[in-house]
């Protein structure tokens, strides 16, 4: 079934709000003091001033504006590539909802609220639900775009 642009926008907004709301609710619990410690994973509060693995933290306050430009640029690009947007509406809703949630943290808290610390066997960077949703959204998009598209092309041939 082919999705109309209006249906795609509705789905995008729904996924966006679900991811954004879930992430902000979890972060609220963390900010209110929820903690957990175990031999595998800890839930602790950290304010990340950079991006993944604290990269670009030297940009400090200007990083949030750079990220806004990046998100707006990507959204404008997607509106011009409407078939790509319609094909990956859910994935883009996940990425945008998570990305905007992390940007909001920068404005409200001075850094992204991170809290998941995996340390079984090795130390891993502290991350949050939004980070996972960005990874899952991009991963599913890449798998669907490259692997399933190649399969479709073979069927058509």
UniProtKB/Swiss-Prot annotation:
Pathway membership, UniProt: Protein modification; lipoprotein biosynthesis (signal peptide cleavage)
Catalytic reaction list: Release of signal peptides from bacterial membrane prolipoproteins. Hydrolyzes -Xaa-Yaa-Zaa-|-(S,diacylglyceryl)Cys-, in which Xaa is hydrophobic (preferably Leu), and Yaa (Ala or Ser) and Zaa (Gly or Ala) have small, neutral side chains
Alphabetically ordered keywords of this record: Aspartyl protease, Cell inner membrane, Cell membrane, Hydrolase, Membrane, Protease, Transmembrane, Transmembrane helix
Record GO cellular component, one term: plasma membrane
Entry EC number(s): 3.4.23.36
Gene Ontology MF term list: aspartic-type endopeptidase activity
HAMAP family in the record: LspA (MF_00161)
Family: Belongs to the peptidase A8 family.
Function as written in the Swiss-Prot or TrEMBL entry: This protein specifically catalyzes the removal of signal peptides from prolipoproteins.
Name of protein: Lipoprotein signal peptidase
Source organism of this protein record: Helicobacter acinonychis (strain Sheeba)
Gene name of this polypeptide: lspA
């Amino acid at each position: 079934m082919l999705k109309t642009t209006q249906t795609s926008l509705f789905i995008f907004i729904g996924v966006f709000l679900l991811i954004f709301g879930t992430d902000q609710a979890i972060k609220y619990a963390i900010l209110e003091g929820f903690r957990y410690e175990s031999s595998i994973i800890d839930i602790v509060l950290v304010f990340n001033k950079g991006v993944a693995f604290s990269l670009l933290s030297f940009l400090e306050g200007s990083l949030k504006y750079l990220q806004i430009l990046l998100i707006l640029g990507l959204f404008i690009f997607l509106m011009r590539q409407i078939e790509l947007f319609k094909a990956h509406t859910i994935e883009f809703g996940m990425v945008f909802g998570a990305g905007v949630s992390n940007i909001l943290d920068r404005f409200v808290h001075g850094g992204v609220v991170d809290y998941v610390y995996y340390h079984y066997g090795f130390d891993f960077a502290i991350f949050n639900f939004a980070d996972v949703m960005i990874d899952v959204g991009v991963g599913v998009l890449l798998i669907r775009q490259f692997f399933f598209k190649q399969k479709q092309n073979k069927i058509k041939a």
